Regions:
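N-terminal small-domain helix-loop-helix segment of the aminotransferase-like
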Residues: 2-4, 9-99, 107
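CheY-like receiver
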Residues: 26, 108, 157-161
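Residue-level detector of anion-binding/catalytic polar loops
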Residues: 33, 118, 139
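Short glycine-rich anion-binding loops that position phosphate/pyrophosphate groups of nucleotides
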Residues: 41, 102, 173-175
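Short acidic capping loops at alpha-helix termini that bridge into adjacent secondary structure
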Residues: 89-95, 115-118, 165
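Conserved PLP-anchoring active-site segment centered on the Schiff-base-forming lysine
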Residues: 111-133
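A short helix-loop-beta submotif of the ANL/AMP-binding
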Residues: 135-141
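Active-site phosphate-binding strand-loop segment of PLP-dependent enzymes
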Residues: 141, 147-175
Length: 175
């Protein structure tokens, strides 16, 4: 028999399951429920997107890309941002493309956080932020927004939580 307490790291053993999972379990047992959970679309992927994926596969584009993502995609993102906002980012040095948002968040936090660094996390927010901070040795610090502030961060809320150990602010949007 495997002793999971010895196999699994202490950092992972102390992680509590996400509370949203309880809602998923309840919703899965009900009919005609619209989930407002983790942002999964309730529609089928549009045909033009599926067709583009099929075409890419047919052209043999099935290999790993550069760690920072496809060069042509990074360039297109850079051009789109510049066109829509007037802000210029270098597609080679300042833009990366990940397989999903969670991976990008994880990479960013791992890159910036040292053991003991505090990370301010404005809530409500996506459930993975605090566990990733903890796994990186950081200290998640919740900054709760309320209905009274229309779930917006105020300067006072921020000042109240900032310390000498604060290294990062996670500011979810929309919030």
């Amino acid at each position: 028999m495997i002793d999971y307490d010895k196999l699994i790291s202490e950092k992972c053993r102390v992680m509590k399951p996400s509370g949203i999972r309880k809602f998923f379990d309840i919703a899965a047992q009900m009919d005609n429920v619209i989930s407002l959970g983790v942002g999964e679309p309730d529609f089928q992927t549009p045909w033009n997107v599926r067709q583009a994926a099929i075409t890419s596969l047919e052209k043999g584009k099935t290999k790993y890309t550069a760690n920072s993502g496809l060069a042509e995609l990074r360039k297109a993102i850079s051009e789109n941002i510049r066109k829509n906002t007037g802000i210029s980012y270098c597609d080679n040095d300042e833009i990366i493309v990940t397989v999903g948002g969670s991976e990008g968040i994880d990479i960013s936090i791992r890159t910036l956080i040292e053991s003991g660094d505090e990370v301010l996390i404005v809530e409500p927010c996506f459930v993975c932020y605090a566990p990733i901070v903890s796994l990186c040795g950081g200290v998640p610090v919740s900054v709760q927004t309320t209905e009274e502030t229309q779930f917006r961060l105020t300067p006072e809320m921020l000042r109240e939580k900032i310390t000498d150990k604060t290294k990062l602010l996670i500011l979810p949007f929309p919030n």
